Amino acid sequence: MGTRFQSFLLVFLLSCLILISTASCERNGDGTIRIGLKKRKLDRSNRLASQLFLKNRGSHWSPKHYFRLNDENADMVPLKNYLDAQYYGDITIGTPPQKFTVIFDTGSSNLWIPSTKCYLSVACYFHSKYKASQSSSYRKNGKPASIRYGTGAISGYFSNDDVKVGDIVVKEQEFIEATSEPGITFLLAKFDGILGLGFKEISVGNSTPVWYNMVEKGLVKEPIFSFWLNRNPKDPEGGEIVFGGVDPKHFKGEHTFVPVTHKGYWQFDMGDLQIAGKPTGYCAKGCSAIADSGTSLLTGPSTVITMINHAIGAQGIVSRECKAVVDQYGKTMLNSLLAQEDPKKVCSQIGVCAYDGTQSVSMGIQSVVDDGTSGLLNQAMCSACEMAAVWMESELTQNQTQERILAYAAELCDHIPTQNQQSAVDCGRVSSMPIVTFSIGGRSFDLTPQDYIFKIGEGVESQCTSGFTAMDIAPPRGPLWILGDIFMGPYHTVFDYGKGRVGFAKAA
């Protein structure tokens, strides 16, 4: 009786938590393969799980580890909170085919799915698992694999089998059978695994990505793939990924292309960012950005995210160190900036930072809100000072008075974001929030409040959060912007592997 009840309970839980839907695929006369994407509706349970994941992760994670690759024991991919991902598609593996729902992720490069040998991770019991013994095309590999995700890791081993994406069959594709998955992130996820579309340079175990094999084996017409993400919440169609080309009906005008500057990620250079038409000045000399389909969020340096938070009224951390810097050193900093001093060196010149040529604001806002030792306090004061210098410089370019500049900097001290977390906003103010503009390839790309604000529920029960999150990446990799679905939704995105470039056009 007990066994029957446990079996019934397991089936019931599976039915409640697994997303059951189908994704269409189509081979067209133009030689392209189109994969229909499913879109997960935003809900409070996943948003809560996302917050718990970030809270549990926070004390163990440091931005300086974000881009560490090829560790002697494990590889590192961009740290993601995949619970924020909204778009998925289906693939099959093996003969006969076994279906899996995956995120098509341009921010990583491996294909991994749960293994039937995943016994001890609860997450595996709530997702489809690959059964090697039931596939006649399976080829044993056995090479161990581990991908670290902050506080946990996906671990397992490599196997080889036929992978079908749409109508394309990639023979003997190497992929990871995950035998261990970290806690809540993958337990509540509406997908089974990840299909990475990044470059081989960041592939765990130097495994050849699925996309590379598509191109090298001549399975696609052109070495291009493109994303259209449907942002209409009332439309059942979630979007589409096209392998081998683009779908003209999903964009307007011409794409603006920029070259990939660092292979591994789809990374490129961008210009300055504007808030309500006002330049921030932070990226006036250029910043790096990554087009990342594996996240719904848009992540950038704390300095600029704080300015956005202030403009949209987002809640943040009140930083005592930041306020102390503005109060004690604000006028001195302004005098240095008026004397045309480099904002990055102002804080060392007034003695707040020990500038050694590498210190910069990108060391992170984590230190700004730390308490404890004098070393942490000094670092917090330095980071706060460097951010304030950028804010003041931005206001000086707008010919603001010294009194207004100091008041503005003090106000921003109340809106510093929590590292890598979203901020709550007033749903009633969304229509009056500013347009945020990115400069890419000499062209302006606007994001409206409807693009960057997530709304859950209706009426008095509604909750709104900003899609902008802060994460500081130290030089030489940073400062860095990660443009997720918030950006790729309004802008159709082309990933041109053949010419090493990324293109954006207004989505239709």
Swiss-Prot record:
Proregion span(s): 26-69
- Signal peptide start and end residues: 1-25
Where it sits in the cell: the answer is: Secreted
Key word DNA-binding present:
no
Q: Name one GO biological process term.
A: response to cadmium ion
- What are the annotated glycosylation sites? N399
Q: Could you confirm whether the keyword Signal appears in this record?
A: yes
Q: Name one GO molecular function term.
A: aspartic-type endopeptidase activity
**Tell me, what does this protein do in biology?**
Involved in the processing and degradation of storage proteins.
Name of the protein:
Aspartic proteinase A3
The protein's organism comes out as Arabidopsis thaliana
Q: Which lineage ranks, top first, belong to the organism behind this chain? A: Eukaryota, Viridiplantae, Streptophyta, Embryophyta, Tracheophyta
- Supply the gene name: APA3
